[in-house]
Structures are given as structure tokens and as C-alpha cells.
């Protein structure tokens, strides 16, 4: 197994991305842990695990931050979690394939706060569109590239 792990913020993970993650685990012999406040329906194995946390705001996020190590990879669309992962020396990837950086996380946090302000004022902001096949390909590519980069870095 590799010297780093893959953590998945599974509460809001689109189902079509699970197969991408499981294939990557097989291909790279990578340990994956799905963390959610509900049963994610993943069959555990030597490399695949799931942790069910108590219901509550950000419990799964906190579990990931508490358990992850530097160089681990985290799949999340939660911007504050991505910021914590980066701060702790990990790599965070959005389910649409964007690899978070210190710069783009700050920009996304500002945008998120602005959108929260708009929603608080009663403005309907809508949500993101469903994950497309193109998004799935971009996520798969970003995940593969990140795993390979981490393999070289930790070898």
C-alpha cells in the first residue's frame, strides 16, 4: 500500500464518482476511507473502509481532519474542510476535478461568504448543476494525476 491515504467526505459525494474512487484504489493499491453521517453502502475490504459519524454539522469533516496526515488526499466539495486539509499538509480535490490550492480556497471562501450573505438577504442563488460525464472524466483525471504526484513525492 502507498504511504498516504485517500479520505472521502461522502455525505455529499455524487454516487457516480464512487466507482472512479474504487477503481483508483484498486489500480494504485490505495487505502480509501469514506466518512459520512449515514451508511454510505460501501462494502469494506482490505483497502476500503467507511466511518459513520454521529449526525451533526461538520462532524464528518472534523473526523477527516482529525485522522488525516500530511500528504493524504481528501475528496470534498466543502470549502472550509478543503482549507483545513491544505493547512494540515494534505491535498483536497473537488468532485468536479479542481485541485484546491491556498489561493483558490481563499477565493472560494470569500465567494461562499458572499453567497451566504445574499441568501441571508432572501436572494435565491440556486445550486450547482448535477455532475456530468465531463465532470466525472475531469475528476478521474485530477485524482489519477494527484495520486501519481503523491507517489513520486513520497517514494
Swiss-Prot record:
Give the originating organism.
Acinetobacter baylyi (strain ATCC 33305 / BD413 / ADP1)
Q: Which InterPro entries match?
A: UPF0178
Where is the segment annotated Disordered? 120-155
PANTHER family the UniProt entry points to? UPF0178 PROTEIN YAII (PTHR35146:SF1)
What name is this protein filed under?
UPF0178 protein ACIAD2644
Q: Cross-referenced NCBIfam families, in alphabetical order?
A: PRK00124.1
Entry similarity comment: Belongs to the UPF0178 family.
List the HAMAP family.
UPF0178
Amino acid at each position: 500500500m502507498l504511504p498516504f491515504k485517500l479520505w472521502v467526505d461522502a455525505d455529499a459525494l455524487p454516487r457516480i464518482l464512487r466507482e472512479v474512487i474504487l477503481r483508483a484504489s484498486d489500480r494504485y493499491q490505495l487505502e480509501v476511507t469514506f466518512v459520512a453521517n449515514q451508511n454510505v453502502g460501501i462494502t469494506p475490504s482490505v483497502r476500503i473502509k467507511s466511518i459513520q459519524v454521529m449526525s451533526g454539522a461538520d462532524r464528518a469533516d472534523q473526523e477527516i481532519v482529525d485522522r488525516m496526515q500530511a500528504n493524504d488526499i481528501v475528496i470534498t466539495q466543502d470549502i472550509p474542510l478543503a482549507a483545513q486539509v491544505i493547512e494540515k499538509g494534505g491535498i483536497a480535490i473537488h468532485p468536479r476535478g479542481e485541485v484546491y490550492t491556498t489561493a483558490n480556497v481563499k477565493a472560494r471562501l470569500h465567494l461562499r461568504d458572499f453567497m451566504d450573505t445574499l441568501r441571508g438577504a432572501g436572494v435565491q442563488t440556486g445550486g450547482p448543476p448535477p455532475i456530468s460525464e465531463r465532470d466525472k472524466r475531469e475528476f478521474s483525471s485530477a485524482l489519477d494525476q494527484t495520486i501519481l504526484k503523491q507517489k513520486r513525492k513520497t517514494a
